A protein has these predicted regions:
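A residue-level signal for conserved active-site and pocket-lining positions in enzyme catalytic cores
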Residues: 28, 104, 118, 170, ...
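Residues at the starts of beta-strands that form the adenosine-phosphate
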Residues: 36-37, 111
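Short, acidic, metal-binding catalytic loop of nucleotide-sugar glycosyltransferases
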Residues: 27-34
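GT-A fold catalytic core of metal-dependent nucleotide-sugar glycosyltransferases
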Residues: 96-148
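Active-site-proximal specificity loops/subdomain of glycosyltransferases
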Residues: 46-107
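Short, polar loop motifs at secondary-structure junctions
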Residues: 41-47, 66-67, 120-124
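A glycosyltransferase accessory/donor-loop signature
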Residues: 1-6, 11-13, 17-23, 39, ...
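Conserved catalytic core of nucleotide-sugar-dependent glycosyltransferases
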Residues: 127-191
Length: 286
């Protein structure tokens, strides 16, 4: 839940996903009416919450320690790592993302919205999902607020294969359909190398977005027009090339100069982890 990376000038960057989750819980309870929050973390994460006296921010805390079975996705089957930009620097961070396919059995709720801890909730649009008749909804469209479309990695897993869906925001109910989705995701995770060859992606690092995309493809009877599982809005993100200067403003390097802008306050996935930490500090400190 906590890691330290070093930038090109040898300064350190502490990334604490528990602190991001605390900030998000505060925001969810501030902006949403459906605001029960369950945190899934490992034993160290819960110990941190207890030591900091921060358990009260969550209605439930579910402990799941790292586990992995199957071939791939990495030489190290416990810790994924991923290179991420931090403005003009590149850092490599541990990437603990392999418990997401277990969310169906871990959730204590009949209706759940599964969020990345760095997807910050600044409005109530997610409340609308609880009023739908769908059993599964996820991100099909992503918008990058700086309008640098090349910063978004994929529209398809491979140009010859299937449409990309994003696991950043995933709504599901306790239903046969949702349970099947997560079973397929677990199968993809366990057999990562096989599915990589089948769907022509080269990622050695396990990605929930890819596993979700394959599961949606199968639920749709392998047809892109058979049934929709798409959220009724874009997932807005700020790419890691951008540095957030407030909750709704950013700057980025353009040639030899810096440029930037602000945007309407809204839910946003902050991919620059140092910026996500700074937002978390602002929220937690009032």
């Amino acid at each position: 839940f906590n890691s330290v990376a070093h930038t090109s000038d040898n300064s350190s960057v502490e990334i604490n996903y528990i602190k991001m989750a605390i900030a998000n819980s505060i925001l969810i309870k501030r902006h949403m009416k459906n605001n029960q929050v369950c945190l899934v973390t490992d034993s160290n994460g819960k110990k941190y919450l207890e030591k900091q006296d921060k358990l009260y921010h969550f209605d439930h805390v579910v402990v799941q320690d790292k586990q992995y079975k199957g071939k791939g996705p990495n030489d190290n089957l416990v810790v994924n790592t991923r290179a991420m930009r931090n403005g003009t620097d590149t850092i490599r961070l541990p990437w603990q993302n392999q418990s997401r396919p277990d969310a169906y059995k871990l959730s204590p709720y009949d209706k759940t919205i599964l969020l990345d801890s760095d997807y910050f909730v600044f409005d109530d649009i997610l409340d609308k999902l609880f009023d739908t008749d769908y059993n599964v909804l996820c991100g099909a469209h992503v918008g990058e607020v700086s309008q640098q479309g090349t910063l978004i990695d994929y529209k398809r897993l491979h140009h010859q294969t299937i449409k990309m869906y994003w696991a950043t925001v995933l709504y599901f109910t306790k239903s046969y359909e949702a349970e099947l989705l997560f079973k397929i995701m677990n199968s993809v995770k366990t057999n990562w190398q096989y599915y990589g060859k089948l769907y022509k992606f080269a990622s050695k690092t396990y990605r929930n977005d890819f596993a979700l995309s394959i599961a949606i493809h199968m639920l749709r009877a392998k047809q892109e027009v058979f049934k929709t599982y798409e959220l009724p809005f874009k997932i807005m993100c700020v790419a890691d090339k951008n540095i957030m200067t407030s909750n709704n403003a950013f700057v980025f390097r353009k040639g030899d100069t810096w440029a930037g802008s602000s945007f309407p306050t809204q839910n946003v996935h902050v991919m620059n982890k140092q910026s996500a930490m700074e937002i978390s500090e602002r929220v937690c400190n009032g």
